[in-house]
């Protein structure tokens, strides 16, 4: 059985020093048997990143919609895993007010980082919590999941204005928090040919690895991917530039799409 110290040691071995701004997408099942279960995992993460900013997604897109248009930040459960639900209830953790793609944070400037999400009108609006990861020198750790769960790539597509990613018609939703409420007109993820856009993000897995934007690692029994947000943005922009919709329209992305990126990066490093 894994212990809290083992988890912290693994984070250190990944090259993380605890002062990072880091977003973690996770599968508790993939992590495996931990002494104390999910609470121990959270204890380890919160202790390790107490001098940084620890972020977990607390999405509600599965439940907050036309038939249930109210997002109560204090009550609405997350639809993206047990760790996210336990995390957002912990003392010192702040949850953003985005009605469908909220995020919870713990650590330095968490409230400041998460502020203003009730004014967003798309899932990962430019200038929002996801987009600003790249400007914060942020990392993304995928624990037991792949890039199909890497919400940050949605934000990259929004910044790049990739066509056919959002619904034309917004949905009226109401955000409720202890100090008030606000109506929001939210566009949703939508593509006429691919109902689950993020499933195609895995087509960029090799590109991210080859270009130094991501590296494979492990945490417990879980295969993990540690990403650099700014580099993920750059590589995605480079690959999509000639053909913005290629993730959906092509079965696979050929290596030629990023070979010149590696060449330019290597020349720059020299």
Predicted features, each with a name:
Residues 114-217:
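Glycine-rich, aromatic-bearing surface loops/beta-hairpins
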Residues 12-21, 133-135:
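Glycine-rich phosphate/diphosphate-binding loops that line cofactor/substrate pockets in enzymes
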Residues 2-9, 267-270:
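Conserved small/polar residues in nucleotide/adenosyl-binding loops
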Residues 47-53, 89-95, 162-172:
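Structural alpha-beta junctions
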Residues 4, 38, 122-123:
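A conditional alpha-helix N-cap/helix-loop micro-motif detector
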Residues 65-154:
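Internal, conserved structured core segments that host functional sites
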Residues 17-67:
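N-terminal active-site beta-alpha-beta segment that forms phosphate/nucleotide-binding
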Residues 190-269:
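Acidic/aromatic/glycine-rich contiguous surface patches that form carbohydrate-binding/processing clefts
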């Amino acid at each position: 059985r894994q212990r809290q110290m083992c988890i912290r040691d693994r984070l250190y071995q990944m090259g993380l020093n605890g002062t990072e701004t880091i977003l973690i997408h996770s599968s508790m099942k993939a992590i495996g048997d931990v002494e104390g279960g999910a609470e121990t995992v959270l204890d380890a993460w919160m202790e390790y990143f107490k001098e940084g900013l620890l972020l977990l997604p607390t999405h509600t897109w599965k439940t907050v919609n036309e038939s249930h248009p109210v997002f109560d930040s204090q009550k609405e459960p997350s639809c993206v895993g047990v760790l996210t639900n336990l995390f957002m209830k912990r003392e010192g953790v702040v949850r953003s007010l985005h009605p469908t793609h909220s995020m919870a944070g713990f650590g330095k400037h968490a409230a400041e980082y998460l502020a203003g999400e009730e004014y967003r009108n798309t899932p990962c609006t430019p200038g929002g919590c996801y987009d600003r990861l790249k400007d914060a020198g942020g990392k993304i750790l995928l624990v037991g999941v792949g890039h199909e769960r890497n919400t940050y790539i949605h934000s990259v597509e929004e910044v790049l204005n990739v066509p056919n990613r959002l619904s034309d018609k917004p949905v009226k939703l109401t955000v409720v928090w202890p100090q008030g409420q606000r109506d929001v007109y939210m566009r949703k993820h939508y593509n006429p040919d691919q109902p689950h856009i993020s499933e195609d993000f895995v087509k960029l897995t090799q590109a991210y690895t080859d270009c130094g934007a991501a590296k494979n690692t492990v945490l417990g029994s879980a295969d993990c991917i540690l990403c650099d947000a700014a580099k993920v943005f750059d590589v995605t922009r480079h690959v999509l530039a000639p053909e913005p919709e290629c993730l959906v329209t092509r079965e696979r992305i050929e290596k030629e799409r990023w070979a010149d990126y590696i060449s330019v990066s290597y020349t720059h490093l020299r």
